[in-house]
Amino acid sequence: GTGSDTSTQRRHLDLGCGTRPRNPYAAPLLYGIDIRSGLQAPGVQAIVAANLALQAIPFADAQFDSVSAYDFIEHIPRVALDVASGSSRLPFIELMNEIWRVLKPDGRLYAVTPLFDHEKMWRDPTHVNPITPKTWRYFCRPELGARMYGFKGEFEMLRQTRCRFKRDYEPARPALGGWLARGADRLTGQAAHLVWEWRALKPPH
């Protein structure tokens, strides 16, 4: 019956989700990817195991209305060397290609990442990919600077802001109190994270 038809329902994918996939756009169908296998979470369609520093996102093209990455992108290396073959890869570029690939036309990328100039970026020894307020220029129009490195997608930056991670800067319009709190965080140096909200530019099917 129509009650079980999920073909037209919005689908969201959370990268590096652990056992608590995030769903910033409140999509009816929630999926996750984590490096660990066998994970489950209530209300989640599936948590698929994949190492996204090495592997493609294990979903078909244009499957998701939105993708999120909370404290994840900083773990993806910019360059990976294969000494045996004398070659190198660009895992960060590859990941951005994959995110764009699995998003539907006009799909949203929502990412929260430690800023390059804050101590929280460098505290964790697995943080290898510092993000700056100008990194977006490599993946978003008009510049698309990462084209020279093999980036095949195209995004439009809808929003970029600093935030304090424990104050979730979700896409929903915040109350005045939230705006004031975030302003105070910036003034006191506690806004350690950068929020991206991008739109995938691609032709309709």
Describe every region a protein language model picked out.
Residues 114-119:
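Short "lid" loop at the C-terminus of a central beta-strand within the Rossmann-like core
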Residues 122-158:
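Conserved Class I S-adenosyl-L-methionine
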Residues 149, 153-205:
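C-terminal lobe and adjacent flexible extensions of AdoMet/dcAdoMet transferase-like proteins
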Residues 66-72, 78:
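A short beta-strand submotif of the Rossmann-like class I SAM-dependent methyltransferase core
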Residues 54-68:
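A short acidic, Gly/Pro-enriched loop at the edge of an enzyme's catalytic core
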